[in-house]
Structures are given as C-alpha cells and as structure tokens.
Amino acid sequence: MVSSKDIIQRRARRVRRRIKMVSHDRPRLSVYRSNQNIYAQVIDDLRGCTLVSASTLESDLKKSLKSGADKEAAFAVGKLIAERAKKAGVNEVVFDRGAYVYHGRVKALAEAAREGGLSF
C-alpha cells in the first residue's frame, strides 16, 4: 500500500521534473506553505541564489493582516513578491508549487503575482 508521504514525494518529483523541462533559464517562483504562514521566493537556479523573497512574517505585512494562514494573506504575499521581482528586473518566472495542490492559498498567491505583473 502506498503511503501519503510517498504520494507527496512523487508529486514533488513530478513537479520539479516539469519545471526543469520548461524553465528555459527563467527564475523559479517557489512557494512554501506552513500552518501559520506562507512564504515565496524568486530563485535563480543558474547562479544558485535567491533574488527576492516575501512572507507573512514581515512586520509591515503582519500588522495589516488578521492571520498569516488564509487566502487574504497569500494574496498579499503574491502582490508583494511581484512588486519586488519587477523592481529587481524579473518579469518572467516558472511557478514552483512543490508538492502542494494548486488550490486555496497557493492559487491565491499565484493569481496575485500574475496581477502584480509576473508572467508564468
């Protein structure tokens, strides 16, 4: 019988493989979701460094949100990461959802980043 941990690992491997196939030297917008917060980073895999990041732990964002773990918070982080990425000169990224299903907070972050001007 396949455990849920195995299913999650397979999903993550499948997503990473597809990202490598379509990346074409574009930076990767990586999302990490915890029970309390949500984090986003734009990572340049060629240089091996993080270009910009945003999370609900940042003080200015934390003050304006009632919770760091809802869709509203994810939307705010998506807007912020798009703004910072555009300021750093990044317009096109590859969305890396990891093993998370494209639904709820992950989807809200992605849609906000698209509204903010990132294309993926």
Curated annotation (Swiss-Prot):
A Pfam family matched in the record: Ribosomal_L18p
Question: Which InterPro entries does this chain map to?
Answer: Ribosomal_uL18_bac-type, Ribosomal_uL18_bac/euk
Give GO BP annotations, semicolon-separated: translation
Keyword field = Ribonucleoprotein, Ribosomal protein, RNA-binding, rRNA-binding
Q: Which GO terms describe its cellular component?
A: cytosolic large ribosomal subunit
Output the Gene Ontology terms for molecular function: 5S rRNA binding; structural constituent of ribosome
Tell me which domain of life the UniProt entry assigns to the organism this sequence originates from: Bacteria
The residues the entry assigns to the signal sequence are: none
Q: What does this protein do?
A: This is one of the proteins that bind and probably mediate the attachment of the 5S RNA into the large ribosomal subunit, where it forms part of the central protuberance.
What family does the database annotate? Belongs to the universal ribosomal protein uL18 family.
Describe the protein's quaternary organization and the partners it interacts with: Part of the 50S ribosomal subunit; part of the 5S rRNA/L5/L18/L25 subcomplex. Contacts the 5S and 23S rRNAs.
Q: What is this protein called?
A: Large ribosomal subunit protein uL18
What is the scientific name of the source organism?
A: Bartonella tribocorum (strain CIP 105476 / IBS 506)
Identify the gene encoding this protein.
rplR
